[in-house]
Amino acid sequence: FISYVNSDTNQISRFANELFNTHIKTDTNDNSYKHILYDNHKINHLDKEIITKIDLAAIVWSATSFRTYLQCKRKFYLQNILKIKEHTLSLKPKAYELGDIIHSILEDYYKDFANDDFSKIEELFNKYKSLNPFLILDLEIWKKKLYDFYLYDKDRLKHRKIIALEKNFECEFEGIKIRGVIDRIDKYEDMYEVIDYKTSSTLSVDTLKNYEKTDDFQLEFYYLAMSEIYKSDKIEAYYYDLNNTVLIKEIALDKKLELLTQKFKELKEISNTEISFSKCEDKSNCTYCAYKTICNRE
């Protein structure tokens, strides 16, 4: 079919017949294609309760998937069990893409740290700007931010050395397998420093007063992996706040490890039982969730 508007103010182009071998009839055939244009498709929301048996203890958990499970069991079920993927038909960058680029720039820069001139970082920014036209302004802003980081970190590394970048790991804790990628590992004398880069302007770090409500165990996963890899307990964990060029120590590490132990024990207790994958109570979690349409939480 050839579709066109035929009304008092619009009609088919006079060049249309020159483009096709057959003569185009201008009488309407609305009935032939109205199901394409005019049908109202009803969205089926997943409102029913989901209860099923799943061996949660057999899953290899990342800090991200575990956080999703703690925040919203329904999202975890859709994303990690049914593996329903978010659509990618968009030219505009996803929220996480800028952070991924900054991570990649820092990884590439420190791979060849012998050349510690800021011009190398500028070259890397130019490379990623050419690949991501929608992020040109954001990357230009971040290039200026990373200059402060470059000066601070250059001085800091006079007294320590980087021993690993983007370190993959898989290990076991309390009978449950965990995996992930550590952004960076430094060594200062006999102390290992595990570092997680953060680009968020709203970085919030758990304290000894509020850690019991946390759902973020990323540095704890890293600490456990480091203990396994380097067979040492001389490990400190830090967030590297790139927005403000400051290292923030995970002061609640020991308490959060105790809490993680408790939560993993709970996982094992309910594994292979009827588990309810309910929607989260805190609807603020739904604001940027890829599954909010399915859950009827738009």
What are the language-model segments listed below?
Residues L98-N168, E172, I251, E258:
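A non-catalytic, helix-rich entry segment at domain boundaries
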Residues F1-D8, S65-T68, G180-D186, C295:
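Conserved helicase core region in the C-terminal RecA-like lobe
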Residues Q11-N31, K213-Y230, T245:
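C-terminal, active-site-flanking charged/polar segments
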Residues T88-P93, E97, P133-D138, E172-I176, ...:
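Short, contiguous acidic/charged loop-to-helix segments that flank catalytic cores in large enzymes
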Residues A57-I59, L78-E86, H103-S104, E122-S130, ...:
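Short acidic (Asp/Glu) and glycine-rich catalytic loops that position anionic groups and cofactors
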Residues F1-I24, T28, E269-Y291:
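C-terminal accessory regions
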Residues A164-Y230, F264:
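Non-catalytic protein-protein interaction segments used by genome-maintenance enzymes to assemble
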